[in-house]
Amino acid sequence: MQLKCPCFVSLGTRQPVWKKLHVSSGFFSGLGLFLLLLSSLCAASAETEVGAMVGSNVVLSCIDPHRRHFNLSGLYVYWQIENPEVSVTYYLPYKSPGINVDSSYKNRGHLSLDSMKQGNFSLYLKNVTPQDTQEFTCRVFMNTATELVKILEEVVRLRVAANFSTPVISTSDSSNPGQERTYTCMSKNGYPEPNLYWINTTDNSLIDTALQNNTVYLNKLGLYDVISTLRLPWTSRGDVLCCVENVALHQNITSISQAESFTGNNTKNPQETHNNELKVLVPVLAVLAAAAFVSFIIYRRTRPHRSYTGPKTVQLELTDHA
């Protein structure tokens, strides 16, 4: 829904510049026409781009370049998405905000009244979602004695991203000569849609895409999951690398799988290997300690008890000689 100012010019209507400024017809020839066209090009290119991670908060800037002070009783501020028309938030004098706001932005977008008095009409957007990848338009109008004049318009393109999980690689089928080996790589909960590559680590070359089958789909969170299946002829040695690329974050996440493993999850994880070793070592040490303790108890019980008679013997010998 596109909001309209009652009894004034609607948001989608632009009053001609020559009517607002009362410019004579001679202005549209020569230098005057050139300057007008130049100003139109500059206005059309006034677009900024902002990046945000899913679940984070972001500020979409809309600031008066002159940083003038404003009386809120004469201001009308609108933040909306143009195509399709979606009302994000707005400020109307003496009106309760949020009544006509789209349900997906209720309690997520707000304006600061104190900041608006200083010429800062920025949108504070909470809990960013993938669906917020949009162009947001800020329009500020000031009420004069006769009309509502637009004093500021900004377009902000929001690009949303989310990190993909570390790829998990598994292999199946026999690793015997003459048979085919199948690799599967899976990564979840990223945004936007990723690129996935398989790399031969022997020479760091990209593996032919004809040998792989990639499937990308949106999950219930609105994020992307990707799964890829790669089929290669058997080789005695030849590790492969699965690489998931997030273009928005300029990020590559990789995992390596060894060809000599037969089945199961072959993604190398040093921490997991260390934990498995500890799980085996601790019980063995406990058994050895218990066996040593039992042996010590048995030894103490079976050792013969002898009396110490040395001094008595010496005393007896002295008595006989006497």
From Swiss-Prot:
Write one Gene Ontology MF term. signaling receptor binding
Give the record's keywords alphabetically: Adaptive immunity, B-cell activation, Cell membrane, Disulfide bond, Glycoprotein, Immunity, Immunoglobulin domain, Membrane, Signal, Transmembrane, Transmembrane helix
User: What are the Ig-like V-type domain coordinates in residue numbering?
Assistant: 49-149
Q: How does it sit in the membrane?
A: Single-pass type I membrane protein
List the signal peptide residues: 1-43
Can you supply one Gene Ontology CC term for this chain's record? external side of plasma membrane
Q: Which family does it belong to?
A: Belongs to the immunoglobulin superfamily. BTN/MOG family.
Q: What is this protein called?
A: ICOS ligand
In which tissues does this protein get expressed? Expressed in lymphoid tissues, primarily in B-cell areas. In the lymph nodes, strongly expressed in the cortex and in both primary and secondary follicles. In other lymphoid tissues, primarily found in the marginal zone of the spleen, the follicles in the Peyer's patches and the medulla of the thymus. Detected on resting splenic T-cells (at protein level). Also expressed in nonlymphoid tissues, such as lung and thymus, as well as, at very low levels, in kidney, liver, peritoneum and testis.
A GO biological process of this protein is: positive regulation of interleukin-4 production
Q: Which residues lie on this side of the membrane: Cytoplasmic?
A: 299-322
Recorded hits in InterPro entries, A to Z, give: CD80_C2-set, Ig-like_dom, Ig-like_dom_sf, Ig-like_fold, Ig_sub, Ig_V-set, IgSF_BTN/MOG
The glycosylation sites annotated in the UniProt record are N71, N120, N163, N200, N213, N252, N265
One Pfam family here: C2-set_2
Q: What does this protein do?
A: Ligand for the T-cell-specific cell surface receptor ICOS. Acts as a costimulatory signal for T-cell proliferation and cytokine secretion; also induces B-cell proliferation and differentiation into plasma cells. Could play an important role in mediating local tissue responses to inflammatory conditions, as well as in modulating the secondary immune response by co-stimulating memory T-cell function. During pregnancy, may function to skew the cytokine of maternal T-cells toward immunoprotective Th2 phenotype.
Q: How does it assemble?
A: Interacts with CTLA4 (in vitro). The interaction with CTLA4 is not observed in different experimental settings.
Q: Which organism is it from?
A: Mus musculus (Mouse)
Q: Where in the cell is it found?
A: Cell membrane
Instruction: Detail the disulphide connectivity of this chain as listed in its UniProt entry.
Output: C62-C138, C185-C243
